[in-house]
């Protein structure tokens, strides 16, 4: 089975703008820094719940979800 590789640069930039660090974003998301690191490096996928919470805490327009999470 082929594994999809997503480009999270836009998401990473927004995390930096809002939280200043991946560690602070991880706290707000309710997961460990290492979990976020795995997700942003395509070693693990974001769950639907994590995407929904991220959209909320980062103030992402729901119409822009694809640009942040599903760009390949």
Locate each region found by the language model.
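Short alpha-helical DNA-recognition segment
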Residues: 19-38
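A short, Lys/Arg-rich alpha-helix, primarily the initiator
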Residues: 1-20, 24
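DNA major-groove recognition helix of helix-turn-helix/homeodomain DNA-binding modules
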Residues: 49-65
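DNA-binding alpha-helical recognition surfaces that contact promoter or target DNA
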Residues: 13, 38, 67
